[in-house]
UniProtKB/Swiss-Prot annotation:
Primary residence: cytoplasm
Residues in coiled coil: none
Gene: alkbh8
Protein name: tRNA (carboxymethyluridine(34)-5-O)-methyltransferase alkbh8
Stretches for region Disordered: 563-582
Catalytic activity: 5-(carboxymethyl)uridine(34) in tRNA + S-adenosyl-L-methionine = 5-(2-methoxy-2-oxoethyl)uridine(34) in tRNA + S-adenosyl-L-homocysteine
Region (Methyltransferase domain): 410-628
Gene Ontology CC terms, in alphabetical order: cytosol; nucleus
Compositional bias segments (type: Basic and acidic residues): 569-582
Lineage of producing organism: Eukaryota, Metazoa, Chordata, Craniata, Vertebrata
Length: 628
C-alpha cells in the first residue's frame, strides 16, 4: 500500500491495482449503502467484503482484525457485505488499513477467496436494538429430549421402506404417519388414514408433552422431514380446518432459525436449538406464517447465553452459524369439525361460511374482488398450479428468441417463472402478486420478486422488452386493465416491445377449437346463466363450467385442487371416487375474458404505443406493441 500521510511514493503495479479496486469498493458502499468514507485518519474502518452477507463469520473476521490491535467494537449488520471495526487507537486502525487491505479471506462457504478492502469512516454509531418478543402462543422447550433419546429416534426412522407414507420432496426425505400431509394445500385426506398410527419411538416424547401439560390433544399425525444445509420451508400457515390448535415441532440433529411473519409485515426470527420442542398455538398457530429460509448459514446471536428465543437486529451481537442436517418431527391432531378460531380473516372454515354464494362486484369493489378471487387463490393453489404450467408456448418463445442478445426483459405476472429461463441470452426479471409463486421462481434460481402489476418498482424506460402473459384479464374493471397496460408500457424504453396475452371469449376461432375446449371430456352447459358484463350491476358473478364455451365476459372460473393419487373420474364413477378419495377442493378465480378487437382497441387508446401485430393463439387474444 502507498503511504497515507500525504506523500506519494512510486506505486508498484500490484499496489495500483489494489488502490483501483479499493476506490471501486468505496464507490459501491456510497452508491448502494450510503456509507461515506473519509480521507483523514480515525479509529474506525469499514471492511468491504467482510460481512455476514459474504459468508464471513464474526469469529473469522475478528481473528484477522485482532492481529493489528485491540478491537473495541465490531459491527456486522445482518445480510450485508461489509462490517465496521473500531480500534482502541488510531495507530492500530492505520496498521489494519495498511496491512489488511487486499488480504484474501476464505468465507465459511465461499468457493473462491474473498478480498477485503478497508477504508476510514468518521464514526461508528452503535444502535441498541432490542430482541423482538416471541409471537403470542409460541413456546420453545429447550433440551426436551436427551442426546440418547435423540439418537434412538433418529436411528429408528426407516427411510428405505417403500410405502405410500414416504416420499422424496424437492430432494429432501419426508415420511408420514397417521395421515399423509399434503404440501399442495397444507392439509390431509381425513378419509384415508395410514395403517399403523404413530411410531412407538415417539411414545416417550409424547408422554412427556402430556405430563408437562404442553398439549390439550393427543397427536394422530406425524410428518418427519430431513433437511440438508441449503434447504428450507416456504412461509405458510397450516390449514385451520385441517388440524387442532397445537402444532409441535421437535428439532433433532441440528439447530435452525425459523422465521415467523405477521400479516402486518413484521418478521421475528426464532432460534430453535437442537433437541428443542416448538409449540405453536393460538395467534402463532393461526395468524403468523412460519418458514425456514433456504440457505447454508443462519445469522444468530454470538453470545453463548442466547441459545433459545428471538434473534435481535443488533449488529454488535451477530455472527454466522453453519447449518447441519436437521430432522424435524412435526406432530398434529387432525380436526374433524370446522375451525372456530379468533382469526376469521385467515380462517378457511369461517371464510367458506361467508362465501357460500357468489360475490357481486358492487358488494366487494374491484380491488377487494381481486384480492379475494385472484391474489389469495393463487397463493393457495400455487404448488398445484405450478405443476400444470411447465411447457412454454411456442409463439411466446419465438418473441423472446427475436430479442437482441443481452436485452433486459421484465415478465410482469411471471407465475412460476416458466418463461424466465427460455432464452439464456436475455437478462430476465420476473414479478408476481403471489408470494408463493415467487418462492417457486426462487427455488428455480430465477430473479423474481413480489409486487402488484399496477405499481412495478422499476424506473421508467428501464427495459428493452416486457411480457404480460395471462395477467391483465384478472383485473376487474376496464380502468384497472388500462392502468396495468400503462404501467407495462412505462417500463419500456422508446422502441421497446411488449407482448400481451389475455384469455379470449372466442375459444373457437375460424372453426378451430382451442386446446382448452379440446380437452373437455363432457359437453356440460354453463353452471349458471350469464348475468351481463356491466360491473356496476349488483348481480352475482356467474360460475363458469370448465372446458366449455364462455357465456359471459366477467365470471368466476373454478380451480379444482385434486387429492393425490386420484383415479380418472368419469360421470359413472364420480360418486364412488369421491367416497374413496374425497371431493376436490374448489377455488374460484375472477376473469374478464376479452372479445375480438377489445385488447387491440384498449392498446390504441394509449398515445405512446403502436400495435405491431395482433393475433389469436390457443384461446387467447395477443398483441405485440412498440413504445413510441
Amino acid at each position: 500500500m502507498g503511504s497515507i500521510d500525504g506523500t506519494r511514493p512510486k506505486l508498484s503495479k500490484d499496489n495500483k491495482k489494489l488502490l483501483k479496486k479499493q476506490a471501486k469498493a468505496k464507490h459501491i458502499l456510497l452508491k448502494h449503502e450510503g456509507i461515506e468514507t473519509v480521507l483523514h485518519l480515525s479509529q474506525s474502518l469499514v471492511v468491504a467484503n467482510g460481512g455476514l452477507g459474504n459468508g464471513v463469520s464474526r469469529q473469522q473476521l475478528l481473528a484477522v482484525l485482532e492481529r493489528c490491535g485491540k478491537v473495541e467494537t465490531l459491527l456486522m449488520p445482518p445480510n450485508k457485505p461489509y462490517a465496521f471495526v473500531t480500534y482502541s487507537s488510531a495507530e492500530e486502525a492505520i496498521k489494519a488499513y495498511s496491512s489488511l487491505s487486499g488480504q484474501e479471506l476464505c468465507g465459511e462457504d465461499a468457493e473462491q477467496p474473498i478480498t477485503l478492502y478497508l477504508s476510514f469512516v468518521e464514526k461508528v454509531v452503535v444502535k441498541e436494538v432490542l430482541s423482538p418478543s416471541l409471537p403470542p402462543g409460541l413456546i420453545i422447550v429447550e433440551d426436551f429430549v436427551s442426546p440418547e433419546q435423540e439418537r434412538t429416534m433418529l436411528e429408528s426412522i426407516d427411510w428405505d421402506s417403500e410405502t405410500s407414507s414416504q416420499k422424496s420432496l424437492k430432494h429432501r426425505q419426508v415420511k408420514h404417519y397417521g395421515y399423509e400431509f399434503r404440501y399442495d394445500n397444507n392439509n390431509v385426506d381425513k378419509d384415508k388414514p395410514l395403517p399403523g398410527g404413530l411410531p412407538d419411538f415417539c411414545t416417550e416424547a409424547l408422554r412427556k408433552c402430556v405430563q408437562r401439560g404442553l398439549i390439550k390433544h393427543d397427536p394422530d399425525q406425524l410428518t418427519i422431514n430431513q433437511y440438508e444445509p441449503g434447504q428450507g420451508i416456504p412461509p405458510h400457515v397450516d390449514t385451520h380446518s385441517a388440524f387442532e390448535d397445537e402444532i409441535l415441532s421437535l428439532s433433532l440433529g441440528a439447530e435452525i432459525v425459523m422465521d415467523f411473519k405477521h400479516p402486518n409485515g413484521s418478521v421475528v426470527p426464532v432460534m430453535l436449538p437442537q433437541r428443542s420442542l416448538l409449540i405453536m398455538s393460538g395467534e402463532s398457530r393461526y395468524l403468523w406464517t412460519h418458514g425456514i429460509t433456504p440457505r447454508k448459514f443462519d445469522v444468530i446471536q454470538v453470545s453463548e447465553g442466547q441459545t433459545v428465543g428471538t434473534i435481535s437486529g443488533n449488529s454488535g451481537e451477530l455472527t454466522l452459524s453453519k447449518r447441519s442436517t436437521r430432522t424435524s418431527f412435526t406432530f398434529r391432531k387432525v380436526r374433524h369439525s370446522p375451525c372456530d378460531c379468533a382469526f376469521p380473516s385467515e380462517c378457511d372454515s369461517q371464510q367458506t361460511q361467508k362465501e357460500k354464494s357468489p360475490p357481486t362486484v358492487g358488494e366487494l369493489g374491484a380491488s377487494t374482488l381481486e384480492r379475494e378471487y385472484v391474489h389469495k387463490v393463487y397463493d393457495d393453489i400455487a404448488g398445484h398450479f405450478s405443476s400444470t404450467r411447465h411447457t412454454p408456448w411456442p409463439k411466446i418463445g419465438d418473441f423472446l428468441a427475436s430479442l437482441p442478445k443481452g436485452s433486459l426483459v421484465a415478465d410482469v405476472g411471471c407465475g412460476n417463472g416458466k418463461y424466465l429461463g427460455v432464452n439464456k441470452d436475455l437478462c430476465m426479471i420476473g414479478c408476481d402478486r403471489s408470494k408463493n409463486l415467487v418462492d417457486i421462481c426462487r427455488e428455480r434460481t430465477f430473479e423474481a420478486f413480489v409486487c402488484d402489476a399496477l405499481s412495478v418498482p422499476f424506473r421508467a424506460g428501464a427495459f428493452d422488452a416486457c411480457i404480460s402473459i395471462a395477467v391483465i384479464h384478472h383485473f376487474a374493471t376496464e380502468e384497472r386493465r388500462i392502468a396495468a397496460l400503462q404501467e407495462l408500457i412505462r417500463l419500456l424504453r422508446k422502441g421497446g416491445k411488449a407482448l400481451i396475452y389475455v384469455w379470449a371469449l372466442e375459444q373457437e376461432y375460424k372453426k378451430n377449437k382451442s386446446k382448452y375446449l379440446k380437452e373437455s371430456k363432457t359437453s356440460q352447459g354453463p353452471s349458471s346463466d350469464a348475468l351481463g358484463t356491466n360491473l356496476a350491476v349488483k348481480a352475482p358473478l356467474p360460475i363458469h363450467t370448465n372446458r366449455t364455451s364462455f357465456h359471459s365476459q366477467d365470471l368466476l372460473v373454478p380451480w379444482h385442487l385434486k387429492p393425490t393419487n386420484k383415479s380418472k373420474v368419469t360421470p359413472e364413477n364420480k360418486e364412488q371416487n369421491e367416497k374413496e378419495h374425497g371431493p376436490d377442493s374448489v377455488y374460484h378465480r375472477f376473469y374478464h375474458v376479452f372479445c375480438e378487437g377489445e385488447l387491440e382497441a384498449m392498446c390504441n387508446r394509449l398515445s405512446n404505443v403502436a400495435v405491431q401485430h395482433s393475433y389469436h393463439d390457443q384461446g387467447n387474444w395477443c398483441v405485440i406493441l412498440e413504445k413510441l
